Amino acid sequence: MINVYDDFTKLNEVILGDINLHLLETVNVKYRQQVEDIFLQTRDDLVAIQTVLESKGVKVHRPKISKAFAKTITTPAWTEQGVRNCLSPRDSFAVVGDVLLEGASHKRSSHFESLYYKELFVELFQQGGKWISMPPPALSDLSYDNESYLTNIEPILDTAQLARFGNRLLVSTRGAGNQLGVEWINRTFDKFEVIAMDGCFSGHLDAQIKIIRPGLVISPYAREKHPDFMQKWDIIPTKIYGDALAIIDDRFQDDDWDNTYFQTSMLSYDENTVFVFDHYKKLFPTFIKDMERKGVECVFIPFKHQHWFSQGSTCLTCDINRSGGMEVYD
């Protein structure tokens, strides 16, 4: 049953992404062997993550992969070499309350990404779930701007720009959405209090802040930058990861191109348990100790190439069912 009103109550059902190896044919021959190695290792890591999730009683769904997704995509506005890989469903899909939402991604390669999950979405709909999509954006050149990245001529919003907190819905537009996208969310989910968080958050919201439970948040930002309801919360401080992206062009030569890379995209099992990548034990021991002091258990999972993919454990998943409801948190 579709039910997600927060990002921290007990996780019962989830989508876990995968790697479509057929997309290797769209990769520059110069890098193809290295990318294949990364793809294969990542696929193995995802199998291990699925095993950990299932050991905790979580029902896990996986995308349906097809060679057809490597075909060239052509619309009246653009041409793209293949559908985006199915590694990070959280970027394009989210359950908001009792509604399965397909977002309006700013990436042209995501135009047909839902085909990976179509059978599952139909199944969830047949079980009684609600299912809606944002208007598919044209994503012509007019949708992009050098200064703000995205213009405001059509609604655009990655679903990774949403964070759920009971009757509140937090949303950011920086880099992966625009104001029309936020307004579409505001009108469509009018039973929620929609809170815009554009004061400082850049990139996907789930990679910037993480609500562990009411009263505790992981964040790199000063207290005054947070919404009013968070002003008295405990904050576990982190670094802003943005500087690492400046050397992204080197990632094919060095898979450790940003070893200090940290993002708060961490999947919660419940209010006291989060899934954290293995290498954080070595790279961020202070953070792990801070979590333990707050009574939060870190369950370590493998994901060797987080740096290369720029993904966290939340990015790799899409919650389908959590135990929480539309609570009103003080």
Features from the language model and the residues they span:
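The feature marks the mature, well-folded catalytic cores of soluble enzymes
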Residues: 1-330
